[in-house]
């Protein structure tokens, strides 16, 4: 509204100034007289807009609003194919399936609740700082701790590039990515073909020894989205990679080798006793050398970029797939949107992934990464509260202790605004798609408030329970610097504002005895 008012005022100014001659402007001393101008310059028609631009500087652009400078466009995607990348001793085994746009967004009138419908994606121009040659970095770091330290100490060349990125302020864009992330769970292997001599039909159990990425493309392959499959954990229905995912989840997201209590079988031997002491270098080495997913996802990314050399790549994923997507986005500097992902910043630090240099002293390079995490705060995994000996995660052998995300996070306050209870079912991608993203957040909040008012008018009992960010320490503002009043602004938006979690801290109850990086 304010920008619109300014635009009308500016139009009045323009019309008023138009009644003056150029000579009148010269007499006021606003532009040099004719004798001070080159003849060729003075002969050009006087552009009042250029003159106003000089007067107002960049403020003229602000008066018209940012929308005119967003350079938005719309893209539609369909499911083109899927890749399966083996890991560990089966890293050479790959498979591919072609789907020929089986899931598509061609019909703009399609039912958005239909799982096979993907809404169009709106894009914006975004400047990203990324390594000039990330593939060389990945090649140098190898799979040993020593190689990773060598790569981390190597000075990288960085570049600023303007790219098309998904406009996550648009609900339908967020919904489209969520549906693509959901499609990555489809486990029909009837269409898979082996690559490099690998025959899926004669390799029992191959689905449980790798990662999967579904490839969505525009019709001209100008842009592709890689959707990585997330965790097939047993308490959410199990799946063909549940055993492998559990081991890697515990390596990636636990504070110290999944050492929840003395009765646990840990995934590494870094616990040093005294209740809360752990070896920092030890857990870094264990994650780099024992976790098989990071080298596998970089291999998958390289294979996809080789198959689509002229396409820009975006990445998405849910749960573990979202965390792995974020690690890829950090490594290769590509736009990434994740859903209900556990905090992956600690894993990125332990893996010693490269961070671009900060542009300003007060700017966080972690917050500037082209990564956006989307989750609702009723999910104990995404909020980092599914831990402790009595938690659901612990009961099934998962030590989901990390909570801090890189980039920025869009957090739907389903607990405070919609009255949801904290439950593991809120971690499901279908819960987010069906119960949150089908309409604008502002509309959902409005309907909930109207329902509460209706109950109150009939004499019913209303429970209003406040909720704060899970890493809140009791201050008057959240640890990320946003007050409760700031987050209430989300109630008026189609999608909550993306905010940094840079002040979040993981594993504050642990003491790491080596130097902490």
Swiss-Prot record:
Glycosylated residues are: 187, 221, 303
Region (Disordered) spans which residues? 466-499
Q: Which GO terms describe its biological process?
A: multivesicular body membrane disassembly; neutral lipid catabolic process; pexophagy; phosphatidylserine catabolic process; piecemeal microautophagy of the nucleus; vacuolar protein processing
Task: Please give the superkingdom of this protein's source.
Answer: Eukaryota
Family designation = Belongs to the AB hydrolase superfamily. Lipase family.
- General function of this protein: Lipase which is essential for lysis of subvacuolar cytoplasm to vacuole targeted bodies and intravacuolar autophagic bodies. Involved in the lysis of intravacuolar multivesicular body (MVB) vesicles. The intravacuolar membrane disintegration by ATG15 is critical to life span extension.
A matching Pfam family: Lipase_3
Topological domains on the Lumenal side lie at 28-517
State the organism named in the record.
Mycosarcoma maydis (Corn smut fungus)
What's the subunit arrangement here? Binds to both phosphatidylinositol (PI) and phosphatidylinositol 3,5-bisphosphate (PIP2).
* Keyword Aminoacyl-tRNA synthetase set for record: no
State the organism's lineage: Eukaryota, Fungi, Dikarya, Basidiomycota, Ustilaginomycotina
Q: Which GO terms describe its cellular component?
A: endoplasmic reticulum; membrane; multivesicular body membrane; vacuolar lumen; vacuolar membrane
Q: What is its EC number?
A: 3.1.1.3
Looking at the UniProt entry, the stretches that span the membrane are 7-27
PANTHER family reported for this sequence: LIPASE ATG15-RELATED (PTHR47175:SF2)
Localization (cell): Endosome, Multivesicular body membrane; Prevacuolar compartment membrane
UniProt topology in membrane: Single-pass type II membrane protein
Identify this protein by name: Putative lipase ATG15
Name the enzyme group at the top EC level: hydrolase
Which PROSITE patterns does the record match to this protein? LIPASE_SER
Q: Which UniProt keywords apply?
A: Autophagy, Endosome, Glycoprotein, Hydrolase, Lipid degradation, Lipid metabolism, Membrane, Signal-anchor, Transmembrane, Transmembrane helix
Topological domains on the Cytoplasmic side lie at: 1-6
Q: Which residues form the active site?
A: 319 (charge relay system)
Primary residence? membrane
According to the UniProt entry, which residue ranges have a biased composition of type Acidic residues?
A: 477-491
